[in-house]
Amino acid sequence: MADFFDTLSDKHIAMCAKQPVFFVATAAEDARINLSPKGYDAFRVLAPNKVAYLDLGGSGNETHAHLAADTHESGGRITLMFCNFEQPALILRIYGRGRPVLPQDAGWTELAGHFTLLPGTRQIFVIDVESVQTSCGWGVPFMAYEAERPTLKKAHAQADPEQWEAKMKDRTSSIDGLPARATDRYIAGTPLD
């Protein structure tokens, strides 16, 4: 049975912090639904009703395009899902409205201070939480976490900044043609071990 909450509780926040992966879903009105897994230490709770996550440059920019396409003052619709792959069984969904904040945007410096910036950081998504849902998660399998995949961080760390910036400028539309803004700079982030 599902339970709904207006904000994130301390128990919810602790559950999210333990998960090595979470999932992000967005949908613009006339576009395909996008669903993406997210890893690394990229999720932060800014307040019980506000969360954010760090986004690295990747193969597309669907989330940005979907959130920007919505004219709602708080941004586009977004859902984040966390699954506990250990005990106790639990699924937690965060429903809200989100917006991208890029390095060239007002508020970037303060927001970025909540994260350890990784090589290739492209933007931070800020989500105003509208509701939180928990459900049993009994159908979610047990899975053991091994390690982060280092490939994306290594590729960004070894990138030529000018080539990386040019590549990100190519990520200015979704697969359905919705526009997305590009970051204006390469962020080297914290050196890798």
Predicted regions and their residues:
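Binding-site signature for planar aromatic cofactors or substrates
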Residues: 1-193
